[in-house]
Amino acid sequence: MEAGEGKERVPKQRQVLIFFVLLGIAQASCQPRHYSVAEETESGSFVANLLKDLGLEIGELAVRGARVVSKGKKMHLQFDRQTGDLLLNEKLDREELCGPTEPCVLPFQVLLENPLQFFQAELRIRDVNDHSPVFLDKEILLKIPESITPGTTFLIERAQDLDVGTNSLQNYTISPNFHFHLNLQDSLDGIILPQLVLNRALDREEQPEIRLTLTALDGGSPPRSGTALVRIEVVDINDNVPEFAKLLYEVQIPEDSPVGSQVAIVSARDLDIGTNGEISYAFSQASEDIRKTFRLSAKSGELLLRQKLDFESIQTYTVNIQATDGGGLSGTCVVFVQVMDLNDNPPELTMSTLINQIPENLQDTLIAVFSVSDPDSGDNGRMVCSIQDDLPFFLKPSVENFYTLVISTALDRETRSEYNITITVTDFGTPRLKTEHNITVLVSDVNDNAPAFTQTSYTLFVRENNSPALHIGSVSATDRDSGTNAQVTYSLLPPQDPHLPLASLVSINADNGHLFALQSLDYEALQAFEFRVGAADRGSPALSSEALVRVLVLDANDNSPFVLYPLQNGSAPCTELVPRAAEPGYLVTKVVAVDGDSGQNAWLSYQLLKATEPGLFGVWAHNGEVRTARLLRERDAAKQRLVVLVKDNGEPPRSATATLHVLLVDGFSQPYLLLPEAAPAQAQADLLTVYLVVALASVSSLFLFSVLLFVAVRLCRRSRAASVGRCSVPEGPFPGQMVDVSGTGTLSQSYQYEVCLTGGSGTNEFKFLKPIIPNFVAQGAERVSEANPSFRKSFEFT
């Protein structure tokens, strides 16, 4: 148990030891450091080295922003931060600075700003013997009755010496004579008062006047001296000395009393009569300050104010007044004047450190260091400091009337960029006086705001076939910061789609956000694309944001209709067969066309442009179906050529033509063959034979037709494609998107016709297929062909 307690005592003892060490350090920093210098020392003279006294390293004073702060507006000292030397800024006159006060001490502070630390110091000004004793009156007149008995003392005017200490007035001597010797007496104030002592009786008839030289000596090395003539007039006997009613008068007078105010009235009486009883009043042992401040009436003894009083300069006056009768006898009294302090001085504020510009987002940062003072006393000299309540700053009291102005909360330049702070110092006097000091603190910008786009996304419309470098739109971002922190630079961000060639499509002006199309856009190749743009400021570090830009390409009518069927590529044309017995409205074929554009630019209309037999055929305007318009006649030519115009609804409209060949046949017994010109006669002769063969073939083929129909349906369902024989079919490539046509007349599914003609010796074969509809899936399909996709007929002729 004891061992454990011993172990616990050791940390406690250490804690107590550390506490006392820290307490000693704190007291050491508060105790002033003392320095001294002789008065009248030349400016720039060395006083002390603060670097050594404060225990700091070389260069630390400059880094910590050391400075010397003293009361008042006059700087008596200069300080070298680099060397730490404290030098005199000017010659110092101790008498001017301190007057009779001894010791003469000038307090000052050594202020270290970073971190904040104060050191108290005092500069004592040592007196030098630079003033000689001076008598205010070069001639001192004494009227002494001849009846005065030996041993009587006479107080004479003392000399003034502005020096203090050993350099002040120390001794008086009188010239050798038979009647008087000199006696020195110390007053309560420590002043040496010279007195003449009568050695033997005077005889006016023997010597009516005595002249003596009074010499005042100071204690300097070498000593200085001053002389005055003491002239003694021996008068007739006057055996009564004037007596004052009181030996001590105590009065109080406010410091704001006007000039001419009555301070006091002294009164003395003399029992003698005649001239020996006539009393006159005069100052005795009065200093120059008393003579300047007060005026004494020689007849009435009224003490009046000659000039304004100032409590802050002198608080009390001791006035010696002498009453002298006509016979030369005199008595003295003392008037003790106490100046009453009034609150006539407003507080004073001295700014030591001020930082006018501070970055935002800082907290607990020092803005200013200042001191306050009030020359008044008591409550008149007590002060309180304050600033406005609605500011993010607070005042922190320091040592000996020093205050620091500190940031309480982080500043935001975007909310407020400038603060006008009024520091108010008020005393507790009546009435209360105050001093206001205004400072302006500018908040410098920190890059704490990223650029913000005016929109999170932008939609731009560009018509296709635009010219390269076309301005297609703009993006805009703003930054709440200022200066370079608010300068925004725009850029294109890498696209999310790796296959999008963004760098070749658009560019952006880095300064103003203008977007340009780098190439001519094609709606049919690219209808829309999107990308991201970034906006970055030029702060450090730079902040950025991004926005989405969507570009929609508007279609232009730059594609003509494309005819899918019948194919117009120069190959052998397909020939449509129409029986002569066809009724009006018989579907001959259908012109199928598409348009690569969109919208109304892809709305197609059809019209019959040319025909071998006008009025025989008609074309439906919206779906391109070619139908018979009337019954066929015998005189109608067997070969019909139709030109169908396909036109879109664009502005201006574009068009294409399709050429159809129609063969009019009497039933399907004999196809029309391109034979030599000599064949028509023979064909007419064999017309009956053809009809018979057709009838026989029809009957014979009924069975085969059923079988073929079943097989065709099976094959179509499996392969989803039409069986193609030796015939003229649409050839050549066409884009898949051309099949995708809305309900504007262009089919959503393809028609395919087969016409096969085979010529040979004695055998002719004709095959007619109804439209075969492949399994194409297209957008916007309007309808499906009315014909059965699996329907097939086959006719054979021999």
Curated annotation (Swiss-Prot):
Signal peptide: 1-30
Domain Cadherin: 37-135, 136-244, 249-349, 354-453, 458-563, 570-673
Side of membrane Extracellular, spans: 31-692
Residues the record marks as carrying a glycan: 171, 420, 438, 569
Membrane topology label: Single-pass type I membrane protein
One Gene Ontology CC term in the entry: membrane
Chief place of localization: membrane
Protein location: Cell membrane
InterPro entries: Cadherin-like_dom (IPR002126), Cadherin-like_sf (IPR015919), Cadherin_C (IPR032455), Cadherin_CS (IPR020894), Cadherin_N (IPR013164), Protocadherin/Cadherin-CA (IPR050174)
GO terms, biological process: calcium-dependent cell-cell adhesion via plasma membrane cell adhesion molecules; cell adhesion; chemical synaptic transmission; homophilic cell adhesion via plasma membrane adhesion molecules; nervous system development; synapse assembly
Cytoplasmic topological domain: 714-798
Keywords carried by this UniProt record: Acetylation, Calcium, Cell adhesion, Cell membrane, Glycoprotein, Membrane, Repeat, Signal, Transmembrane, Transmembrane helix
Membrane among keywords: yes
Reported function: Potential calcium-dependent cell-adhesion protein. May be involved in the establishment and maintenance of specific neuronal connections in the brain.
Listed name of the protein: Protocadherin beta-2
Source organism (scientific name): Homo sapiens
